[in-house]
Amino acid sequence: MDTASIRGLSWSTLDPASYNSRKRSFEQMLLQQDSNESSRRTSPSRTHSRVDLERHSSHIVSLSSSNGSPSLEDPENRLYESPASARQYYGDESLILVGFPSAGKKTLGLIASAALRREFVDFDTVFVGKTGLSPREYIEAHGATAYRSVEDELTSEVFRSRQKGCVLVGFFAMASNRQRRLLKSLSTTNPIIHIQRDLGNMIHRGDSDKDRLYRTYQLSEKMHRRFANFEFFNIFQPMADDKPLGPLRLKATEREFVRFLNGIFPQSEASRGLKNLCSSSYTYALQAPSSWLDDPQADYTELDSGADAVEILVEMSPQNQQDLFFKLSQRVAVLRKYCRVPIILDLETSATMNYIAQVNLLELVIRQAPDVIMVSLDMSPHLVKQLSLAKGHSKIIGKYHQKGPISENWDLTNLQTVIDKASLLHCSAIRLTGEAYETNNNFGCVRVVLEARKLSDLPVSCYNTGEYGRSSICLNPILSPVVLPSQSTKQGITLADAQRGLFSSFWRTKKNFTVFGQNVSYSLTPAMHNAACIACGMPHTCDYVESDRLARIREVFERESQGGLAIVYPYKTEVVQMMDEMSLDAKVIGAVNTVVIERISTNEGSPKLYLKGYNTDHIGIRTCIEKNLSPANAIRSQTSALIIGAGGMARAAIYACIKAGVRNICIFNRTEANARRLADYFATVYTNLRLTILTDLSTPWPTDLWHPTIIVSCIPAHKVGDNDAPDFLIPEQWLGSSTGGVFVEFAYKPLVTRLIRFMQSRRSQGWIVADGLDVLVEQGIAQFEILTDRPAPSHIMRRTVREQYSIAQNAHSDHETTET
């Protein structure tokens, strides 16, 4: 598909006349179907088999409740038709998106098509190709009955040939009985995603009959929920009526949906998984209250606080069961939008819930495709079987809670029973909790964890709850519950509290990190890392050492509390020879910007320094590319990138493009020989690349390459030694992308370079600019996580860098004013 056609495709962007006409057709046919089925059910002149009655009645949602939503506990209410299939997909199954008009299916389908590199199949397009008329035009010309016949045949025909390698949208909008049977069959082999959206955001001006629209919506939601096997809530992206669509308006939606898809089709480069959460010592699960997530005034940046996972308690009560279908998907969507770490859904059932309600609640949780599902180890055998079949790629944590404390006198025979239950459920970890009556109760938790390691390889989390149980949370090794900073109470502790407890009791050792290089007094890295450490409750510090000699770095290595270094210009390549071990990234790039210092015991008594080298520059560049590349410019096989420069950062930039999936890379450098050496090097490492040298600014862009949608400037913007900063602009003949692209500037001294001003003037053409501070922060986030082995509070780091840069600029202006 032409990339230009991707931008802005959704019902909500159609002109009002087309939108309302199309939606009215949908409403009329669905309500007519409802009316027909209702009359068939109530007509005394017709008799039906029990199967017929069940099939027809199951299509109509009961609207007797206050909001028209079904009850989880109603034993007569079969919410889900899709079977308890394994939901284990391996990457080539076609993706089917269903839902109410204007929920954003087409937009999400195009995003999925680009991300998964699959054919995009839209029902309306197929229908026009078959009949020469749009669905609305066909209905007006031939009637609904004729349309239904063509629709049934066309749908069956498409799915006979496209069950693999496609993304299909617009089908099953008002599914007939024949289509429902097909949909039920497809749910055993293919992921079917029910797209949800707040109805208030789908009502357009001119929708005068709100009650009728609401009824139509309820019917649609009921039917699609029944036959789908996943649910995704599409968060509304507000837009002013008088402003055109910006190229990044759908970027957040793209990020959230691709992350959701990664839970269905796991990717090799997924975020920190359960293995990391349970193998690392002292990890934390941030508890996100449902009421807080539902509050539109909440500061959702708190979700990015440095925890290893975010957890939601999913429980049903008479007050919330009516809207839990909608609310749970919406809450999970908020988590995907505002945090980077795995999502845990903690399923809470009670003895008062009937079996139907428990099955429905479990299915609702599984449909969110969370990273982890937490369930009680006392779950009924039938639910255990349901979960084992239907969990897909979600991991399971088994939980066991006892009334009273887990103390030193706790019967360890209970531990073996708990472990056996967890093994039967195929759990990846266990959480044991008790209720502390006094602080002394907490020592037993440490004992239980140690004993569990002797009995099983399953990681065990063990702590007491309540005010007196807080110290056990500090000492618990994995997935300790921590509360939001704004929700701190005597009943819980924040992440910063937990970390301070570890360091103050000497379970963790304070470290120092150093920025090493020339002219580093202006570096923003120390302030960035120090702010992050403070936010996480860690007493680590970061300073800088400015030196004209690399040899001085040895003194820094030898400092007693030195935990690592950030290496900057000009020592990134020279320090390579000092490393005992390097990451693959650093080896390929040939440069190290992050050093971790380990101390290994020796027979001589004094520990030996062991230096590990990493490179996070490429991560900073790649993240800036991926965050700012619009869905219209999603990377595909024809995508081209332009790299300006041929030094160390250019190596990192090329590597970043390669890791992002770009295979066509052009290099421009004022010294052609250096550019050619760089191209020759990567040509030997990656044989599937096409590397082209642009010899000078008059060189035309290669005619057989797409114009670049990624441009990375890797040249200094200030004088370096005796060399003046390069001064040129990108030629117009290289800027031919009709959908713009992303321009990434490495330099931030000054922040607004001439190239940045030049590219900012092309914003109306779709160009997005990421400046040097953006790159600094993104590589700094990765650097922080390597140095501290902790997730970074990225919003703190971003804010600190911008604030410190502004302070430095103001101080510089004041100094110049004083001198004048």
Swiss-Prot record:
Keywords: Quinate metabolism, Repressor, Transcription, Transcription regulation
Domain observations: Is homologous throughout its length with the C-terminal 3 domains of the pentafunctional AROM protein. The function of the 2 C-terminal domains may be to act as a molecular sensor that detects the presence of quinate pathway intermediates as a prerequisite for the presumed conformational changes necessary for the control of transcription regulation.
Any one Gene Ontology molecular-function term assigned to this protein's record: 3-dehydroquinate dehydratase activity
InterPro entries (alphabetical): Aldolase_TIM, Aminoacid_DH-like_N_sf, DHquinase_I, NAD(P)-bd_dom_sf, P-loop_NTPase, SDH_C, Shikimate/glucono_kinase, Shikimate_DH-bd_N
Stored CDD domains: DHQase_I, NAD_bind_Shikimate_DH
Subunit description: Interacts with qutA; transcriptional activator of the quinate utilization pathway genes.
GO biological process per UniProt: chorismate biosynthetic process; quinate metabolic process; shikimate metabolic process
Protein name in the entry: Quinate repressor protein
Gene3D superfamilies reported in the protein's UniProt record: Aldolase class I, Leucine Dehydrogenase, chain A, domain 1, NAD(P)-binding Rossmann-like Domain, P-loop containing nucleotide triphosphate hydrolases
Compositional bias (Low complexity): 59-71
Family note: In the N-terminal section; belongs to the shikimate kinase family.
Function: Multi-domain repressor protein that negatively regulates transcription of the quinate utilization pathway genes. May mediate its repressor activity by binding directly to the qutA activator protein.
Name of the coding gene: qutR
Stretches the record annotates as Disordered: 25-79
